Design a protein with these regions (language model features):
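Class I SAM-dependent methyltransferase SAM-binding "motif I" and its flanking Rossmann-like core
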Residues: 94-167, 210-213
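Class I S-adenosyl-L-methionine
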Residues: 1-19, 24-118, 218-226
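A contiguous loop/helix-start segment that scaffolds small-molecule binding in enzyme catalytic cores
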Residues: 6-9, 82-87, 100, 143, ...
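Short, acidic/turn-prone active-site loops that include or flank metal/cofactor-
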Residues: 16, 41-43, 59-66, 121-123, ...
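Short hydrophobic/aromatic-enriched beta-strand-loop microsegments
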Residues: 54-61, 112-116, 135-142, 191-200
Length: 267
């Protein structure tokens, strides 16, 4: 399939925000969909690619203040598909990584509505690429763990990790929140050494990217940028602390992104 089909819901990953990091499949669906239901974190640069006759609606939720309930999102998807429209449910990053896609898939199945999941570049992979550092390493990081600092309603007091964290793991915390001190305490309880590198990166792989780095013993007082933020922890991040991945090198990557987004004629 090259374009969208009527009566189908497409759960599409928008990637980290740079339109050039969209998949070809995602772009074709945006150009042909009748209805686009998007999260708040999907930037205007991506929404600008939507067909001009499509109905575009924000259904995002931020800081616990939903514009629409999850059940309401389900209803919009199902009603639009049953009306014979092609529907793109556009999510930041990858739909299947902390994107509540499981709930939406269950609702579509229960309603006997056809759907397709279109993967996107998740923020963790975008962050590693933007920083020029691999998330895994043959010698120091043979495991990669994704977790979230934002749990289901009423469970935000739960620790990000239970038990001992493997020494050879890179931990990626999605939505860590502002209280990095709490996370630092939980990492210590999980057996993470004080000299392990930590990097908080905001708006990874976009023109708004910023990042700060410290060892675990400095994480308590570290201030990260505006949401969305990722916290990366592990020996694989040591190059940032040691200066192997310089801030100047990172700025070059961001400047190139800025040229692509601001100037359509840039090579």
């Amino acid at each position: 399939m090259t374009t969208s089909e009527k009566g189908v819901v497409y759960l599409v990953g928008a990637g980290p925000g740079d339109p050039e990091l969209l998949t070809v499949r995602a772009l074709r669906l945006l150009e042909s969909a009748d209805v686009v239901l998007h999260d708040d974190l999907v930037p205007a640069e991506v929404l600008a690619l939507v067909h001009r006759h499509a109905l575009v609606t924000s259904v995002g939720k931020r800081c616990g203040r939903p514009r629409i309930t999850q059940a309401g999102i389900h209803a919009l998807m199902i009603e639009s598909a049953r009306a014979g429209q092609s529907v793109v449910r556009l999510k930041s990053g990858d739909p299947l990584v902390f994107g509540r896609a499981g709930e939406e898939i269950a609702a579509l199945r229960a309603a006997c509505v056809r759907f397709e999941v279109v993967p996107g570049v998740t923020a963790a992979f975008a962050a590693g690429a933007a920083l020029g550092l691999p998330l895994t390493d043959r010698k120091s990081a043979s495991k990669l763990i994704f977790c979230t600092g934002h749990h289901a309603d009423g469970k935000d007091s739960a620790p990000i990790w239970s038990g001992r964290l493997p020494d050879d793991a890179t931990l990626v915390v999605y939505m860590p929140g502002r209280d990095l001190g709490r996370i630092a305490r939980e990492l210590r309880e999980a057996g993470v050494a004080e000299d392990v590198a930590c990097c908080a990166i905001s708006h990874a792989a976009t023109v708004r990217q910023s990042w700060v780095v410290a060892r675990l013993d400095g994480l308590d007082g570290m201030e990260c940028g505006p949401a969305p933020v990722l916290l990366l922890v592990g020996r694989a991040m040591a190059g940032l602390v040691e200066g192997k991945a310089s801030h100047a090198e990172t700025l070059c990557v961001i400047e190139e992104l800025a040229v692509r987004l601001v100037s359509p004629d840039a090579e």
